[in-house]
A protein has these predicted regions:
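Structural signal for membrane-spanning alpha-helices in multi-pass inner-membrane proteins
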Residues: 35, 90-97, 159, 163, ...
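Substrate-agnostic recognition of the 12-TM MFS/MFS-like secondary transporter fold
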Residues: 15-31, 55-70, 74-89, 106-161, ...
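Hydrophobic/aromatic positions within or immediately flanking transmembrane alpha-helices
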Residues: 17, 49-52, 79-80, 108, ...
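Hydrophobic alpha-helical transmembrane segments
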Residues: 104-115, 139-193, 255, 259, ...
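C-terminal transmembrane bundle of multi-pass solute transporters/carriers
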Residues: 61-65, 76-78, 85, 92, ...
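Helix-loop boundary and gating motifs at the non-cytosolic
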Residues: 2-60, 211-261
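Helix-breaking motifs and short loop linkers at transmembrane-helix boundaries and internal kinks
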Residues: 42, 74, 96-101, 302-303
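Juxtamembrane intracellular "pre-TM" segments in multi-pass secondary transporters
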Residues: 1-14, 190-224, 406-411, 442
């Protein structure tokens, strides 16, 4: 029976992996041309920015609802429904662009609807991953990371090539990718329906997710770390792009910078299983955290665009190692009945805090030298590295708590054992086998 279950999990994980790859490549291909089409229709960069903002708004507004629904309803149906909704939204854009009649209202509405669908898919997908994850979860998570980085490399290149064939072609590919991904998810045999002991109100469920993340030390750490690293990385990328632009670097050189960063992430994800087989995870955490600080300090002295790109590639090579370790710990500590809500809380915090990163980078680049700006971000990474080092004992503890944590306040599942709920807030006693993958890893539009 164990062999049969492992074979089924391996098959379903492959379907999950391929569905995400097809979906992300299609979304990346259309995502790079969406602002170009909006700009061609309106002639306004502000309008193109508005469409992008509405896509983000759709995700953020829907995320809390989607997280609760992902812990109540069959997750496979939610994933398939979200993919088909996104396909319908992009089909409307496809027809309008092919007919030569797209309008700003239509593009903005489609972007918002796709953002809504994305939130639904992310929440349900994060809840489903534990059910299909093979026994060697770190290797599987590394493969997911590699898939995401590969899509970030291939998708924009494909989108640019398809755009040369016709403005509507990338949207056709995106629609097809959504439909194919929906079919692959539908073929998963594993029951993805969440465990549910008691039906409570929507607000009660939402508060339970927030409370669980805050009271579980490891989940609280991972949430803060992920938000901080995404903020710093987002600002660093904008810093490099803006600095290169002010120095007169050609667009091709800036594109090379981003490509090198993505390639570094891909290599890091592919090499993660080998690293984990030879080095203790906590050793990897300490080394990677402080090595990224050193690389950004060196970046403060870089003057050539290719040098920025090489250093970014090395930074992004290290970051998947940390991401896989932290995701694996979160998977061990999150109950099945809480996965959707926990993933939503962690992802939403990260996205909200990441939003001002481009603005901060722009202000710093305008007011300070490239050296000072890079050192500011190196200092921010040093704070994160120190925070990570201080939490090593908790990260390595079986129940995710450290010696300073009150066992009466946060038991093995991180819930308050003195509030008399006995798990009725949506938790259960099987927390040690549960888990999530953050939306940063699992996305409809990469």
């Amino acid at each position: 029976m164990k062999t049969e279950e492992n074979a089924r999990r391996a098959r379903d994980f492959r379907l999950y992996w391929i569905a995400g790859a097809v979906d992300q490549i299609g979304s990346q291909a259309s995502g790079i041309v969406f602002p170009l089409v909006t700009l061609a229709v309106t002639g306004s960069p502000a309008a193109a920015g508005l469409v992008g903002a509405l896509a983000l708004a759709g995700r953020l507004v829907t995320a809390p609802v989607a997280g609760v629904l992902a812990d109540r309803l069959p997750r496979k149906r939610l994933m398939v429904g979200a993919l088909l909704l996104a396909a319908a939204a992009m089909a409307v854009v496809l027809v309008a662009v092919a007919a030569g009649v797209p309008t700003l209202a239509l593009l903005a509405g489609a972007a918002f609807v796709e953002g809504v669908a994305q939130a639904g898919y992310e929440s349900a997908g994060a809840g489903a991953i534990r059910r299909v994850l093979p026994a060697d979860d770190k290797k599987a998570l590394a493969r997911l990371e590699a898939r995401n980085h590969a899509a970030q490399i291939a998708g924009p290149v494909l989108g640019g090539a398809l755009y040369q064939l016709g403005r509507w072609v990338p949207f056709l590919v995106d629609v097809v990718s959504y439909v194919v991904a929906a079919g692959l998810v539908a073929a998963i045999r594993t029951d993805l329906t969440p465990d549910r002991q008691e039906r409570t109100s929507f607000l009660t469920d939402l508060r339970a997710g927030l409370r669980f993340v805050w009271r579980q030390p490891v989940l609280r750490f991972v949430t803060i770390w992920a938000a901080g690293i995404n903020f710093v990385f987002g600002a660093l990328i904008y810093h490099a792009i803006l600095t290169a632009g002010r120095q007169g670097a050609p667009a091709a050189s800036i594109g090379l910078l981003l490509t090198l960063a993505s390639v570094g992430g891909l290599v890091g994800a592919l090499g993660a299983p080998l690293v984990f087989s030879r080095v203790r995870p906590m050793t990897v955490v300490v080394f990677a955290s402080w090595a990224m600080v050193a690389l950004v300090v060196v970046m403060s002295q870089a003057r050539q665009t290719w040098t920025y790109g090489l250093l970014f590639g090395l930074v992004f090579l290290l970051s998947p190692l940390l991401g896989v370790i932290f995701q694996s710990r979160a998977i061990e500590l999150t109950p099945d009945a809480m996965q959707g809500r926990v993933a939503t809380v962690m992802g939403t915090v990260g996205e909200v805090l990441q939003t001002p990163a481009p603005l901060l980078a722009g202000v710093l680049v305008a007011w300070q030298s490239p050296t000072v700006v890079a050192l500011v971000f190196a200092a921010a990474l040093a704070v994160l590295a120190a925070y990570t080092t201080a939490n090593l004992r908790r990260l390595g503890a079986p129940d995710g708590t450290g010696p300073d944590d009150d066992p009466q306040r946060a038991g093995p599942t991180g819930t308050d054992s003195t509030d008399g709920t006995d798990g009725t807030d949506g938790t259960d006693q099987d927390a040690g086998r549960a888990g999530i993958v953050t939306p940063a890893t699992e996305e409809v539009r990469g």
